[in-house]
């Protein structure tokens, strides 16, 4: 039996369900999910292995017009990834027509030799007439090998999407062991899980002015518990107060919720300590971005 393997990137506007889709396929919480846009900052590499194929997924930041150095970094990662892969999944969600954000990405995809599959997500929220109308509009662009409707959250039609992807995989080796589902360091995943909870507990302009650095991650000697220290960086003193909350209640909520997810990830009890520090304009500081892993 021949074995197929290859690399697939997932692109799309912020907040269309790219990370939800990848997490549904992999079956583990690897990519950060939030109801706020631009939540994925690093090119997360996840691995899905079956007996006769292996797919390596690259979950890129949403392609958008950048407003700062961090935004430039995110878009650079997303567009460069298109050159490295065997197939591209372009994820869009419900709407009445192709919006300017999706049209911007379509323009970026013109002339790309890599096979592109359009994934219409959130079909559970669309009626048949709207779905058919969108299908026709995207088909007229002429750049998609296939168009498929799914619900990433519910898992509807995701199996058929996988079958489509496998068609474009070349024969190749297992790039990663069967048990491996990501190449990301645990410290980075822990930081992203904490940042997800910050996005959940805060609002307005605060979330995307926030970064998390895991400074300590160590198993206690002779005990089934991992000590984790992490620093939350924000850009304004007022943001620090909002993240901490009255009497520290909001920070405690962030910590408790993050700890529960981290314990599931690591399969161990976790003692999590969080600090909040102000680092003004960190998104435009190349040194700070490099320190936080955005290089």
UniProtKB/Swiss-Prot annotation:
| Start and end residues of each stretch annotated as G5 | 150-152
Cite the InterPro entries for this sequence: G_ERA_dom (IPR030388), GTP-bd (IPR006073), GTPase_Era-like (IPR005662), KH_dom-like_a/b (IPR015946), KH_dom_type_2 (IPR004044), KH_sf_prok-type (IPR009019), P-loop_NTPase (IPR027417), Small_GTP-bd (IPR005225)
Residues that hold GTP according to the record: 12-19, 59-63, 121-124
- Which family is annotated? Belongs to the TRAFAC class TrmE-Era-EngA-EngB-Septin-like GTPase superfamily. Era GTPase family.
Single GO BP term: ribosomal small subunit assembly
Protein name listed in UniProt? GTPase Era
> According to the UniProt record, where is the region G1?
12-19
Q: What is the lineage of its organism?
A: Bacteria, Bacillati, Bacillota, Clostridia, Peptostreptococcales
**Where located?**
Cytoplasm; Cell membrane
Q: Where is this region: G4?
A: 121-124
* Era-type G domain: residues covered: 4-171
> According to the lineage, what is the superkingdom?
Bacteria
Q: How does it sit in the membrane?
A: Peripheral membrane protein
Name the job this protein performs. An essential GTPase that binds both GDP and GTP, with rapid nucleotide exchange. Plays a role in 16S rRNA processing and 30S ribosomal subunit biogenesis and possibly also in cell cycle regulation and energy metabolism.
Subunit structure, interactors included: Monomer.
Entry's Gene Ontology cellular component terms: cytosol; plasma membrane
Give the Gene Ontology MF terms in alphabetical order. GTP binding; GTPase activity; ribosomal small subunit binding; small ribosomal subunit rRNA binding
